[in-house]
């Protein structure tokens, strides 16, 4: 009978820690490209919908990723994307 191989790789950090690390990186990048009031509004909207939950963190990451990609693709003079 087939068996899954043993996991001998390095230990991964917990998913929640990884989410918080990713959110922090994306927030730092977003602050460089978007006005703070807009980012605060998005954060407040996500908090209103999802509360203080991991689903809210995931949704905020998705929104900021899409906003940054669109910004890079269509208008950021510092980006090589779309050049």
UniProtKB/Swiss-Prot annotation:
Location of Phosphoserine modifications: 79
Domain of life, per lineage: Viruses
Any Gene Ontology biological process: viral penetration into host nucleus
Main location: virion
GO CC term (a single one): virion component
Subcellular location: Virion; Host nucleus
Keywords: Activator, AIDS, Cell cycle, Host nucleus, Host-virus interaction, Phosphoprotein, Transcription, Transcription regulation, Viral penetration into host nucleus, Virion, Virus entry into host cell
Any Pfam family: VPR
Disulfide bonding pattern of the chain: none
InterPro entries: RetroV_VpR/X
Function: Stimulates gene expression driven by the HIV-2 LTR. Prevents infected cells from undergoing mitosis and proliferating, by inducing arrest or delay in the G2 phase of the cell cycle. Cell cycle arrest creates a favorable environment for maximizing viral expression and production.
Complex and partners: Interacts with human UNG.
Protein name, as recorded: Protein Vpr
């Amino acid at each position: 009978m087939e068996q899954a191989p043993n996991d001998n790789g390095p230990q991964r950090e917990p998913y929640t820690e990884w989410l918080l690390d990713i959110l922090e990186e994306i927030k730092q990048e977003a602050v460089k490209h978007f006005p703070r009031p807009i980012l605060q509004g998005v954060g407040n909207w996500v908090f209103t919908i999802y509360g203080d939950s991991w689903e809210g963190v995931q949704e905020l990451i998705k929104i900021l990723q899409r906003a940054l990609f669109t910004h890079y693709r269509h208008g950021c003079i510092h980006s090589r994307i779309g050049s």
